[in-house]
Amino acid sequence: MNPYCLKAVKWRDGKGDIVRDFVNSCRKYGIMPGIYVGIRWNSLLGIHNFKAQGEGVFARNRQQWYKQMCEKMVEELCTRYGDLFLIWFDGGADDPEGDGPDVLPVVTKYQPDCLFYHNVQRADFRWGGSETGTVAYPCWSSFPQPYSHHKQSDSDEEHL
């Protein structure tokens, strides 16, 4: 479909499953596997911030196809590799009222025990908040559920 996949490379004759290898390697060394997924932007489909750019039928069709593609991709990640420790959506996952795919029900159905990060409905942990990969010490990134960092809490005392 596009040159951004492993079908175009010589590694394992284009039939390798890099996610399978990653998960198997994690388990081999006693590491709980987590998956990092980016669905907020898609250059091939002209998606920016969960929304197809442009107007008219073509944009609406791309929007619908993008949503279905993302939901199926997340379903595949959640069903092919056994139990996952976490699924991290870079830039978040859209809420059901938004334009983007609704992936939370997929993760909840197929990976009920995995940590989910994040949309306005659910965020099981906090991001440290640094694109440099550094955070202040100590860094406590937990908070009670249900709570989303997009919503205001009832009181500051409820949160670490």
Q: Where do the model's predicted regions map?
A:
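Mature catalytic domains of secreted/periplasmic carbohydrate-active enzymes
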Residues: 1-160
